[in-house]
Amino acid sequence: MSATANLKKDYQERIVPALMKQFGYTSVMQVPVLKKIVINQGLGMATGDKKIIDVAVSELTAITGQKAVPTVSKKDISNFKLRKKMPIGVMVTLRREQMYEFLERLVRIALPRIRDFKGIESKLDGRGNYTLGINEQIIFPEINIDAITKILGMNITFVTSAQSDEEGYALLKEFGLPFKNAKKQN
């Protein structure tokens, strides 16, 4: 059975009943669900070197298994030598099977490879969504350490249908995200 089937099955069989009991939901449709995962790399240094965008696109494509899209600037900023529609970042939006696959690889393989890893911060955005900042792309096994020219970080945003931070936290905790300050549940 694939990682996707494992996480989906785990969500339906274990996570949904646990969250229904914890929050007192009357319908399965009230239970929060993970809608999408957005991976974003802001590459400000790309204004000087255009090859950085190509490298970032290929690395993010290798990490996620889906083609990465360059993001462009919206306006001119002369202090940063930035022109309108100049590529300054890379992003990927994962949904459905690829989302669950990436989540499983992130939790089981990539996060434990971070040096001195003690867990991730437990602050959500107020609407049940969570953004995780990663400083180096080399924690992913798909990246060849010898081939990289520059260490690049990324932001990984987990978008949920949760109405509150408490619901979003509970959902992500059940999916296996290793939060640092694990809140005590009653």
From Swiss-Prot:
Signal peptide: none
Keyword Repressor: no
GO terms classed as biological process: translation
The UniProt record lists the keyword rRNA-binding: yes
A GO CC term attached to the entry: ribosome
Keywords: Ribonucleoprotein, Ribosomal protein, RNA-binding, rRNA-binding, tRNA-binding
GO molecular function: rRNA binding; structural constituent of ribosome; tRNA binding
InterPro entries registered for this protein in UniProt: Ribosomal_uL5, Ribosomal_uL5_bac-type, Ribosomal_uL5_C, Ribosomal_uL5_dom_sf, Ribosomal_uL5_N
Oligomeric and partner information: Part of the 50S ribosomal subunit; part of the 5S rRNA/L5/L18/L25 subcomplex. Contacts the 5S rRNA and the P site tRNA. Forms a bridge to the 30S subunit in the 70S ribosome.
Function comment: This is one of the proteins that bind and probably mediate the attachment of the 5S RNA into the large ribosomal subunit, where it forms part of the central protuberance. In the 70S ribosome it contacts protein S13 of the 30S subunit (bridge B1b), connecting the 2 subunits; this bridge is implicated in subunit movement. Contacts the P site tRNA; the 5S rRNA and some of its associated proteins might help stabilize positioning of ribosome-bound tRNAs.
Family: Belongs to the universal ribosomal protein uL5 family.
Protein name, entry field: Large ribosomal subunit protein uL5
UniProt organism field: Porphyromonas gingivalis (strain ATCC BAA-308 / W83)
Taxonomic lineage: Bacteria, Pseudomonadati, Bacteroidota, Bacteroidia, Bacteroidales
Gene: rplE
